[in-house]
Amino acid sequence: MKLPLGLLMICLGLTLAKGETNLPPVFTQTLNNIILYENVTVGTVVFRLEAYDPEGSPVTYGAIGADHFSVDPVSGNITLIKPLDREEKDTLKFLVSIRDRVDPEGESERDNVVEVPITFIILDLNDNPPEFQNTPYEADVNEDAAVGTTIFDKITVKDRDIVGESLDLKCLPQQQSPEACRKFRLHIIKRDATILEAAVVLNDTLNYNQRMVYHFQIEATDGPHKTQTTFEARVKDVQDKPPVFQGSLSTVIDEDSPINTLVLTVHARDGDTGEPRKIVYDLRTNPNDYFLLDAQTGELRTAKPLDREALEDSTGIISLVIRARELVNGVPSDDPLTSATAKATVTIRDVNDSPPVFNHKEYSVSLLENTLPGTPLALDMSVSDADVGINSKFALRLDDVSGVFDVEPKLVTGYSQVNIRVANGTLDYENPNQRKFIVLVVAEETDTNPRLSSTATITVSVLDANDNKPVFEQESYSASVSEAALPGQYIATITARDVDSGSYGDSGIRYSLSGTGAELFHVNEQTGVISLANCHDNGESNRRERRDLNEDEHVEEDDGEGHLEMLSMEAATREIGTEPTVQYTLITQAPEEQASSVPLPAPVPHAAPSGVPAATANDDKAPQTCLDYESETTYFLSYKATDDNGRGSASVVSLRISVTDANDSPPVCESPLYRASVDEGAVVFDSPLIVKARDADTMSRISYRIRGSEQVESIFDIDRETGQIIIRPNATLDVTNLNSDQLIFAVEANDGLFTAHCGVNITVRDVNNHVPNFEQQSYSAVVEENSEIGTSVERVHATDLDTGKNAELRYRIQQGSFDDFGIVETTGEVFVSRKLDFDRRNTYQLQIQASDQGTPSLTGTATLTINVQNSNDKDPYFVPATQHAEVRADAPPGQLVYTLIALDPDVANHNALEFAGTDDITAIDKEGKELPHYDQFKEYFKISRNGKVSVNKQLDRNLFAVMRINVLVTDSTAPNVQQGRGLLIIQIIDVNKNPPRFNAPWSVEQPQIKLQMVEEQPVGTVLTTLQANDEDSSIGEFNISDNDYFAINQTSGMIYTIARLDYEVVKEVKFQVTVSDTGVPALTATADVVVDIINLNDNDPKFSQSDYYFNVTENSPRGTVAGKVEAHDGDVGVFGEITYTLIGENNKYFSIDAYTGNVMVANSSILDREQIKELTLSVVAQDKAPAAVQKSATATIHINILDVNDNAPVFTRDVYNSTVAENAAYQPPAALLQVQAIDQDEGLYGDVRYIITAGNEMGLFKLDAQSGIVYPAQSLSGKHGAYELTISARDTQGSGTMESTTKAIITVLRVNRHKPEFVIPALSNATIEIPGDIVQPDYLLLTVRAMDNDTEENGKVSYHLQVNNRNEQQTGEFKIDEVTGELRAKTQLNRKNRANYDIILVARDAGNPPFESLRLLSVSIVDANENRPEFPDASNPYKVSINENSGRDVKIGHIQAASRSKHNRDIFYYMLLGNEDGAFYVDKLTGDIYTNKSLDREETDVYTLYILASIKADLHISEEERASFSIKTLNRDNTVAKVAITVLDVNDNPPVFEKPIYYAGVNANAKMGAAITLVNATDADQGKNAKIEFMIVASNLYKFGATKSTGSIVPSPFAISQDGRISANTIMAEYNQDRFELEIVARELEQPQSSASTKVNIWVFDGTQLVRVILSRPPEEVYQEQEEIIAELRNATQHRIIVDEIRFHLDSIGRIRMDWCDLYFHAVDPQTQQIAPVDEILKDIDRNYDYLKDYYAGFAIENVVPAYIAIVQDEFDLAVAGLVALVIVLFVGVISFIVLCCCLKHWNLSVPVETRRKEALIKKQIIEDLNTTENPLWIEQKLKLYEEQELTMQVFSEPDHISNSEAPGHLDHRSSLEQVHHVGQTVDNTYATIQPRNNQNRLTGGGGAGGGSMRSGGGASAGGVGGAGLLLARVDPHMNEFADYATLRNNRAPSLYEFTGSTFQAPIRDGDDAVAELI
């Protein structure tokens, strides 16, 4: 640098010295070592040259040799023009020049040029990924290599960058070897930023048999960059597998087998199959040293005698551990890799050497004398035999001379509990000989020789029992008493006798009464004296009388001073919509006034008198008695006598007590309030208004008078005798003159002693006779477009001259609002209801209607015109908001790029919108990176005010590839600024020139790439990675041609496998790879890739079958071929050649040809089927590959030994025993036992069938002949005892000669049906609290009690504690008495040690099987000083009951809490929960519970109250506190009592029928007893009060066509059952076509025997009057939707539809379709009440097709057809027929001869027209089995099935005068059937209807055109198009039954009958008497 500067100074000096020399320009900067990073982007200014000229002339800059840079000659900016790469060159040097201008004219040779070198140093960045060297990586490793062994150390990774993080490696597992990275690890040997060396180290043990090859990915990373390669580790096999046992290691040997008996032979082989070693054996365990094992052969033999009973395992199984060891150098090895153990099991087959043994020798038991037969004795007896199998089978019997007892089971195998039962006879304690029995039980073996046995003794003691009931002298008793009788009045004495003694006899009898009203009477329980009970409470000083006068609405109270206070409540409920008004009047009367004055409340406007009338007596001195004749005249009671002091047996007789009458009843209004309505101006009521009162006393006469205002009495009058209210003749009813439209007053009813007041409410109806009138007929208004919702627009008003509701007006908008305006209904104010839009609608014409509330309602209308004023209120907006444009990179400035689009609904001219761009502009380079904001970006494009976007400056795609400009649109006409924003995206399109190129060895001239790959590589193995480059753009993607084996990563170019490569399938794979760049347009290059596949021995031999089954007959000679096995190896060459060998335990009996695979008999001695039925061999197929890679396969050969028939069936047991409960199911039947007989033969000869030959005389059992399972044939309930059946077994499916028999003993036991139910404690989680800090031992905590509804032993309950799932009598702290249930403390319980215990109580019955119930009990020990009151048994709820309708203040129960305080403090009671409706209240001081209102059981039948006991006298419980209470917490709280109140039923509801009227039909052919219909009535009461009976009270007959009844038929032709089923009570044929109207009454069985009535209309029909609906749904679903189907058919036909039957559908071959059904109905004309014709109903259905078609899919209706169709079979005159036939023959003959002569000279050989017609009709196959219908209603989707037939058939026209052009209305579809038509003319009628033949033809007659006639429907028949075929069959004219559909199908009619396209119309002919079913 110093040298050039020196030279420059010398030159400068010389120049100055001359004085006129021009000095050169000078650089002002140092140009050496300028630093640049290699990632500087192209186009960046990297340096700025600066220089000056001493003379001040301008200078220009230049560069020499600068490949990467360009120099701006003016500014001196050095710009990068080519990407930098430090790895290619880290220093760039070139010359820069500076030139001054000596000549002002321009450049000249005299200009000074200075050239100076410049140096750029390129700094490195981490921009290159790591690179693996010397790939691919692979290694071999032995499977026994030690962990830590280095298996490969040649991994080298280099990084061209010198900066960045240190290189690192990572192992990535692959799908085919997920555990590879666990087996191997990467060890770093050397590492820095540029190079890394590593090794692969074994990290876990290997196993060749588990995996032979491992693949994993090695990933190298330098931080941001990653590179991957594949590593393959191949595992080599070594000798490391222990021996493997083969064959079965289980066998059976007899217990008495001699020493040295062969037990089994052990086989094992070396687990390493390459070079297997020899195996030796030894025993590791040998229980009792029973066995010896041969070390060489593996034979296991007995070493000493065996004893099965000496074994610990009762099953007789001995487990041996056998070791197999490999011989290594002739010495057995002990290490785990060369030895193995296995467990062998030897089962010792038992021999008989042990007798049966009882668990005790002696037993004793007691039982009552009334013990029932079959009851088991309470014995713990069991018996067992230590032997097994038949050696353990023994029989039990009794040595019992009395014959009273029996033992079960009779036969036992091994072990059983023994039951001794009372078998027969009745035990009688009074017989001294029956007080004790001694019985001997004998157990003796049955199937052994000798038969071993043992005995046990049972002593049975009989106890006395109460076995006689008290006996009354009469079956029933009766008595009477006056209703005025006083308490204590004697009524009767009734006693009984009992023949038992002591308390079981007369002295122990106790008497009691029960039944409704029993509380009114008292019986002395010892003497039987019956008297009247005291039912009054006389304990209070002041008399408080609550006398029920008309449901307690009138109450009198005596205050103790002789004054009566009468509380009269008046309540009236007005019409719906008004509130009820109630008036209370309290009148105090002195005693002297009570007899004369009658209080009457003054009328209250709009209030009725008493809701329930009050009655007042003139004398209150009547005696107060308990009986009331008017309430109950007779009491039917049960009188019971119970012995044993009321605890024993009982007898009951009926007792009737009659009550005699007394005069004490006041008059009662039949209705508390009478209502009537009358029009103003009327002179009479529409219906007579009569007020009625009744008096229970028959001698009373009631008179009436009106009590009301003067106005009322001036208008109305009443008849004093009848109570009829009339309008006085001179009275005028005018609403305007009345204070109200309701006149309210009372009518007084008086019988001379009592008075009642009946309320009357008369409404005077206004007449609606004025229409509403608007003030204006037209209104107008203006509203702004931007008005808010709810803005008032206009108010309209109308008036009505009527009054009341007739003058109440309601406004509504009829039309014109378009939901933009609404109106206030009551005020008429119109308001904006939705946002207005002038552009959508600017004018509205609203029609407003005002209507009054009268009946009928009158209306008036007016018009409101609303004009909407527009406002500019909407912003302009771009459409779309983001808009896109493209422009080429070489587009010149000024070129139009895009025109922006925006809209504004408020402006009419688009020119009002102005566009502009914003400064918010962003750009993206061609790499996809967003660039920082530069101001010069806005210079490239220009946006005009009209939205035109154009190029403003030359574009540079290297600077940016995409530009995003935020644009703005403004409404220039808006009063305020209205703008819209959008986004314009402009993409710069590049121009591509150079295609990409693959790396070498690929070239354009030689585009082939050859590769190799070993077969059987896992999917995903990388083949190679192709690389490519492009000079002017980047690489876009790689693509591969379609092939089955390889795919390519489109980004990296990595080619990998997608399928398994098999050399045997494909040896070479060819495909093409295409690479494309990212330029526009994209350019590509293609490489042809050829992959050669390298062969491996990778296929195992495969047998053609995994199992082979061969048959060989017994005694086959040596060499007999049993079969052939075949295997195939998919490899090629020696790898695919196979040899065969046999292995296995039985291989010595057979041999195999090593090459052909033929399996032959080698030793026939084992071929004995009775010993061995099947032999199993293993065959091995091996290829001929070297041992290291040799492969094999194994298959199993099953050789079946064929048999001959030589064995009889043998039952597995001589006697089968089964015990079954009496409730065993028999529908479906439950299996009781299964007998089994084994026939050693096979096939048919071994197929056994079973039959019961004896013992089933009662038919209780049935036997499945094939399975041998015995089932109950009927219910076994009540049929206790043992049944012995003899069962026979016969082979050859029951037809053979071999037979054997056995016995089956079935014992039917009583059933233990019920589980015990806890009574105490009652709650499932009960808690008891024990006071005191310390509880002493034996302290009684609780007496547990449970009930079991079973009887005898099944109902006997014992009590236990559950500990660890076992029932115990005691725990560490508690004990329980098993019988009494007393739970006591076992030890001292100290609260300080433990305060709470949880116990599980168990109640268990003694049934078989026993049932038990569990209950959790918590015991809490509380402080004795706690003084809160508690209920003694809070866990057990109080239970009380009360009759419904009982009055208020009735005491129903009492609760009592106790305080633990030493001081007797007061306890107060508060209601907590359960009384939300206020039905009850509790006395705060006493705990008494009272009713607070009358109860109704039908509303609520059970109440549960929670009542708190507290010491606080003023406790207040808020509603929030009540809502927070938890039922679970209250149940555990001892301070809270739970009271369960049951409301008992009173017969206060009458029956109610489900329908007011029923409709039904009955066939005229119905027999007596035929079911017709069912009527249902229900009673809301309960129990016996809900029981009702049905009666037919009238059977009114309406003859056919009559409108009046001929009267009721007696006796009725119908009967009704007690479940409401109506049936025929006579033959119905005589009433054919008549109608009955039955009056049915449902009446209660209990008093007062309320009743209800209904009517049933029954039509007697003929079968031809039914219509059949076919539905593709089961009957049960159709029953559920029956009413909906009827409703739709009724709407369509306008007839009453009556369903007569629903039954299963029969398909085309006569099978029952359980999922389809047919519904039969008849239709009744509602005007004439007669059955409508079938064709009329079908016409109605046709006409309503559009209405019904929407319903048929939902109801699944497939077809609607007549149930029957009548066909006439006319008489046939043979003589006339013969004459007609002769004339026709002669006529046809003459005509034919003439025609023949005329046509001879015009002979033309062609196919006759008639032949073509017949083919058209006959050759077309008819589709028969279609679910179409004869109604066009159901054919909408089924036309195409007949399309071919419709388009091809020819139809004969009928009369000549009918043509295709005639209208459908000119054809009579029915009557045309009776016409006779000529045949001979044919027409083309595509949619013709084929009708049945004329009535002169027979179905069996000839076919063809001459056999009958057809008529043309002209395309206009009533039926429409398509439809199902109609098949008709002739039947016997005297029969009336269904046709056989199968016969119709098999004996088909000619083709003329096979198609119809119309609705079926039943022919109407005189004399029709033949019936056929329409299918």
Swiss-Prot record:
Record's compositionally biased regions (Gly residues): 1900-1916
Signal peptide interval: 1-17
PROSITE patterns hit by this protein: CADHERIN_1, CADHERIN_2
A Pfam cross-reference name: Cadherin
Regions of compositional bias (Polar residues) in chain numbering: 1887-1899
BP terms from Gene Ontology: calcium-dependent cell-cell adhesion via plasma membrane cell adhesion molecules; cell adhesion; cell-cell adhesion mediated by cadherin; homophilic cell adhesion via plasma membrane adhesion molecules
Any GO molecular function: calcium ion binding
Alphabetical list of InterPro entries matching this protein: Cadherin-like_dom, Cadherin-like_sf, Cadherin_CS
GO CC terms of this entry: plasma membrane
Cellular localisation: Cell membrane
Main location (coarse class): membrane
Regions of compositional bias (Acidic residues) in chain numbering: 550-560
Cadherin domain residues: 28-132, 133-245, 246-358, 359-472, 473-669, 670-774, 775-878, 879-998, 999-1103, 1104-1211, 1212-1318, 1319-1431, 1432-1553, 1554-1677
Glycosylation sites (chain numbering): 39, 77, 203, 424, 730, 761, 1039, 1049, 1111, 1163, 1217, 1325, 1349, 1492, 1576, 1691
Membrane topology category: Single-pass type I membrane protein
Sequence ranges on the Extracellular membrane side: 18-1775
Region Disordered: start-end pairs: 535-560, 1887-1916
Record field: compositional bias (Basic and acidic residues): 537-549
Keywords noted in UniProt: Calcium, Cell adhesion, Cell membrane, Glycoprotein, Membrane, Metal-binding, Repeat, Signal, Transmembrane, Transmembrane helix
Keyword Signal: yes
Annotated TM spans: 1776-1796
Segments in the Cytoplasmic topological domain: 1797-1975
Top-level taxon of the source organism: Eukaryota
Function field: Cadherins are calcium-dependent cell adhesion proteins. They preferentially interact with themselves in a homophilic manner in connecting cells.
Domain topic, free-text comment: Three calcium ions are usually bound at the interface of each cadherin domain and rigidify the connections, imparting a strong curvature to the full-length ectodomain.
Protein name (database record): Cadherin-87A
Natural source organism: Drosophila melanogaster (Fruit fly)
